[in-house]
């Protein structure tokens, strides 16, 4: 006998497919939390029809006595929307639920606001108002049985069993929240699901039909795991984009002349990623990608779009130009049959010149005459501060040159693109934080040169996803970070293993995960690195202090060793004057950060690394 909730879901899906129009608009996905702060929190939800919702919230699950502003859900964003709660009290536990105009309600969720400097300040012992906080980070949420630990996503159950959701102030999902599935979901099925007429289909969906498969991918993953849904309802999360959010093993998004289906799906993928996840992220550039229809002529290097005004575009806030592969299947990972591009002019282009409002000069002549779907990408990276720390959330996929694994030190190739790299270096230099976190979806010191025992998906370039094939960028960043006199932590994902690596006395790499994906095998996939000890891959030696490790003789589907990491930033300790008195926060002379790695199946503590802030002036009395 089917579980009642499964039966209801099946009947509801059937009702959608039959084109039902009598169901009221309701909440289909969410709520999820993001954009946390000491006096603010944002709430995301998706509705069955485009419309509105609001949030009721308060200090108890039965005392939701405050009401948010109205959020709008929009059809061209798959009926997703976000509302921000403001004027909240620091370090306070709240409860909330999403409500639609017809009274449809979500389950009750809960969150805790961040502390504030005023909340923690003590004029004598903590004049800066520092406070402690924790976050969880990992990568790799793959739920597909053929390449993961399966649908239940046991790590999230462990996180709840260990009450991690109640302890952490936020989480970082460091890439690969999504894995490709249902990417062939057709526009016609989406129309029925949305209960709209053909005339109501947004122009964006007509122009980029593969987006409906991407949206369905997100909804499928959300539907599949109650543990995952519960986590996002309780823990505000930041995200990096990695290859599976676009297409597995995506390279060369910034290399003019590169013609491959994977990179030119970038802008459609980033749009869906922001619709469902990265709405939560801080953004240095708020300008969205531009999607248009271009007239292209054979042998001519001009692009014409009579709906655009290129003279008014904020070019410093935008990325390069892609002519799309086209068609419904542009975003699938492994099509059952080879698929031909719907557009002979597809590829990566550089904009050389704005000729006039409707005309761009590109880096090369077009091979054929066509009317083509194209986009000019967005820049999806940013930073945020909390206490005495600053986080820089990178995009290692959207502005990435096509690497040269035989010449990894080439100065003309970049993993971030020059603009993002300059932003990062300037941000590190000008930051007033004591601890700096660089959040990179791909690994820093360990190569990613294998596919976990699977088959490489790109046959026109040798695989390496990591910074190890962009050594000029990596060494420049390490030297710059090491010169700052602060502790700098590079948080990484992508490789399905966890490790702690000391690069210099002040620069470290910590990789965490996977939450649910099959582990890679270091001898096959990671440059034959050791489980711990000295390691050299490229010009710079490092020390692997600890790692997870899957021996190559373990069958692929038996490599199920999920991990997660809790990071504790410790700035103060509590010293009330008397037992039961109010908190009195006293600042440590040298604050410290603890990286604690746990087994995702059992919650067993595997490893701890504690790192103190840079040396301070010696205190104490001389001994005669």
PLM feature segments, named:
Residues 4-8, 21, 67:
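Intrinsically disordered, low-complexity segments enriched in Ser/Pro/Gly/Ala and basic residues
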Residues 23-83, 87-624:
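Long, structured stretches of catalytic cores involved in phosphate-ester chemistry, encompassing
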Residues 9-19:
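Bacterial N-terminal signal peptides
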Residues 1-11, 377:
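Bacterial N-terminal signal peptides that target proteins for export
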């Amino acid at each position: 006998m089917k579980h009642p909730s499964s039966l209801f879901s099946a009947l509801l899906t059937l009702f959608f497919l039959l084109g039902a129009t009598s169901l009221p608009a309701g909440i289909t996905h969410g709520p999820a939390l993001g954009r946390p702060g000491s006096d603010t929190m944002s709430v995301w939800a998706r509705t069955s029809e485009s419309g509105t919702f609001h949030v009721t919230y308060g200090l108890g699950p039965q005392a939701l006595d405050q009401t948010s502003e109205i959020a709008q859900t929009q059809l061209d964003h798959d009926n997703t929307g976000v509302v921000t709660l403001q004027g909240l009290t620091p370090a306070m536990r709240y409860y909330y639920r999403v409500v639609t105009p017809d009274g449809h309600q979500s389950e009750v969720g809960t969150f805790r606001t961040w502390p504030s400097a005023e909340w923690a300040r003590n004029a004598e012992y903590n004049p800066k108002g520092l406070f402690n906080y924790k976050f969880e980070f990992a990568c790799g949420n793959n739920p597909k049985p053929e390449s993961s630990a399966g649908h239940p996503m046991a790590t999230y159950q462990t996180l709840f069993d260990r009450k991690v959701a109640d302890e952490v102030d936020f989480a970082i999902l460091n890439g690969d929240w999504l894995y490709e599935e249902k990417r062939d979901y057709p526009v016609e099925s989406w129309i029925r699901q949305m209960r709209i007429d053909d005339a109501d289909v947004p122009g964006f969906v007509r122009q980029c039909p593969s987006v409906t498969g991407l949206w369905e991918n997100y909804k499928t993953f959300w539907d599949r795991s109650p543990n995952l849904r519960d986590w996002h309802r309780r823990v505000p999360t930041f995200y990096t984009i990695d290859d599976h959010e676009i297409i597995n093993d995506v390279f060369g998004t910034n290399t003019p002349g590169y013609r491959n289906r994977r990179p030119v799906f970038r802008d459609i993928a980033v749009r869906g990623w922001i619709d469902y996840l990265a709405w939560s992220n801080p953004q240095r550039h708020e300008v969205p990608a531009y999607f248009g229809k271009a007239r292209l002529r054979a042998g001519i290097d001009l692009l014409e779009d009579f709906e655009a005004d290129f003279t008014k575009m904020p070019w410093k806030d935008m990325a390069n130009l892609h002519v799309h592969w086209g068609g419904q299947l542009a975003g699938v990972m492994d099509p059952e049959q080879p698929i031909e591009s719907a557009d002979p002019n597809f590829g990566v282009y550089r904009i050389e010149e704005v000729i006039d409002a409707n005309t761009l000069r590109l880096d090369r002549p077009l091979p054929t005459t066509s009317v083509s779907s194209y986009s000019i990408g967005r820049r999806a990276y940013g930073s945020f501060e909390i206490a005495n720390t600053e986080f820089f959330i990178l995009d290692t996929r959207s502005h990435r040159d096509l690497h040269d694994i035989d010449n990894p030190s080439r100065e003309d190739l970049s993993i971030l693109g020059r603009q993002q790299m300059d932003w990062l270096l300037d941000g590190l230099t000008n930051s007033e934080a004591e601890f700096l976190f660089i959040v990179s979806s791909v690994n820093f010191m360990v190569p990613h040169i294998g596919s976990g025992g699977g088959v490489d998906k790109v046959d026109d370039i040798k695989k390496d996803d990591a910074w190890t094939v962009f050594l000029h960028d990596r060494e420049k960043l390490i030297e710059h970070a090491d010169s700052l006199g602060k502790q700098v932590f590079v948080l990484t994902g992508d490789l399905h293993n966890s490790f702690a690596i000391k690069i210099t006395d002040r620069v470290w790499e910590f990789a965490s995960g996977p939450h649910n994906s099959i582990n890679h095998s270091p001898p096959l996939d990671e440059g034959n690195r050791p489980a711990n000890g000295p390691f050299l891959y490229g010009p710079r030696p490092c020390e692997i202090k600890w790692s997870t490790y899957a021996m190559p003789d373990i069958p692929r589907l038996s490599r199920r060793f999920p991990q997660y990491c809790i990071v504790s930033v410790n700035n103060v300790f509590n010293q009330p004057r008397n037992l039961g008195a109010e908190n009195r926060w006293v600042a440590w002379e040298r604050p410290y950060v603890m990286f604690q790695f746990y087994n995702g199946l059992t919650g067993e503590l595997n490893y701890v690394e504690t790192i103190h802030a840079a040396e301070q002036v010696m205190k104490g009395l001389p001994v005669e």
